[in-house]
Amino acid sequence: MATSAAAVQDEPATRFAKDQLKAIIERIERLEEEKKTISDDIRDVYAEAKGNGYDVKALRTIVRMRKQDANERAEQETILETYMQALGML
């Protein structure tokens, strides 16, 4: 007894998988939209900071550094200082 493709699509397990897949895709799409909105908001904050006279590049560096582990940040600062001394920049 052969089952047709239409019969397989209507099986409860297949219906569940289709519904689950659709829900996952819709969640991803919603999160992507939220991510875009947040990115736009962050860009606006940097523009506001620039308008108030702050250096945006320095702000981005500080934000990136604050995300790092303190030990990792200290190690990178030590390496940077060593390189700068070797180049006569300090």
From Swiss-Prot:
GO molecular function list: DNA binding
Pfam families attached to this UniProt entry: GapR_DNA-bd
Stated name of the protein: UPF0335 protein RPD_1405
Family: Belongs to the UPF0335 family.
Superkingdom per UniProt: Bacteria
InterPro entries: GapR-like, GapR-like_DNA-bd
